[in-house]
């Protein structure tokens, strides 16, 4: 399995193929549409991420010591953003997730091309993923 940094570098490479942000937004939408279907049973208040303008549900499970994320959003670009985050961090250990520096967000210019509310939502998604990783780490050590 590739490291988080190797996966981030792949994302940076994929986005560097496009100069126009309309093309990059389309790539995000396409990524969201390619995502595995989200099980309706996980669309609960508990799985909703606070701080997002649109509704985003994030489900996490610990499988063989690795955190597996699934997500859904009612907004196409946001669904693409959460899919991108999942592509990079899902399938790694809690420690790997907690120790990661998600530099790809800056490198592809994502944060600066989002509205302030979407940018806050992005930060909320990352924070929630780290919270799940921390909870699983604590559970494994406990």
Q: Where are each of the predicted segments found?
A:
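A generic alpha-helix surface/boundary motif
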Residues: 9, 79-80, 98-99
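A short interface-forming secondary-structure element
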Residues: 73-75
